[in-house]
Amino acid sequence: MTFRFLCWLTGLLLCTAAYAIPQRVISLAPHATEMAYAAGMGEQLIAVSAWSDYPPEAKKLEQVASWQGINLERILALKPDLILAWREGNPQRPLEQLANFSIPIVYLDAKTLDDIPASLRQLATYSRHPEQAERAATDFQQQIGELQHADEKHKAAHTAPLRVFIQFGTQPLFTSSKATLQSQIVSLCGAENIFSDSTVPWPQVSREQVLRRQPQAIIIGGASDKIANTQAFWQPQLTVPVITVNEDWFSRSGPRLLLAAQQICSQLAELKLAPSSAK
């Protein structure tokens, strides 16, 4: 009798655990979509936001949110049992309305590089494949650690940090402060963000402000074909190397920030070895 009871109880617990895993997940931001796939939740996703284009299979899913807002009616019709949201990018009122319908909401709001693996481990509790989430988190931590170790070696060699301007747009001209993931990547690579002291995360700056701070390199998002236009924008007052980084990697607070960090660190390391970088 005891053996049968234990078998029945074990089966019940397994069924309950399986039932607790959400089966109909909606992502309301591109980086949240990437996080979900990295955490092994791809087969649980039923809808995503606009610009959710990675991995490629995400483009096949219905889109229920964009920069214009959230399609609340459609989301409710899809009957999700979990929503992945972003406080800074999603309007709060429809999220509050969704919460009123007792739909669980997980916010993915990474502020630091350490938050990325932490978020992956958080998603592991909702994933059919939690081991995949753990692998992704561990891999991210290990490779970020390798970049950090390389930076420490540069510091030990008394290599002065390059002064870097992180550029977004031209008219208006924006940059990022130390409160952003983008600036943290620059620091990880052993460089100095010239606007790290800004009191707002995404300050609008003038051409004159940038020139006064004398950057030794500029980082922009996009392909290498943007380099010539960026250099032309700053000449003749400023003639420094322009580094490009994949825009999606650099702008989304997801696992591919690691790729952005590797790309930037590699290019900055080359600049440090160049004689012109020692100005």
Swiss-Prot record:
Disulfide bonds: 189-265
Annotated Fe/B12 periplasmic-binding domain residues: 24-276
UniProt KW keywords: Disulfide bond, Periplasm, Signal, Transport
Example of a GO biological process term: cobalamin transport
GO CC aspect terms: periplasmic space
Sequence similarity: Belongs to the BtuF family.
Name of the protein in question: Vitamin B12-binding protein
Source organism: Pectobacterium atrosepticum (strain SCRI 1043 / ATCC BAA-672) (Erwinia carotovora subsp. atroseptica)
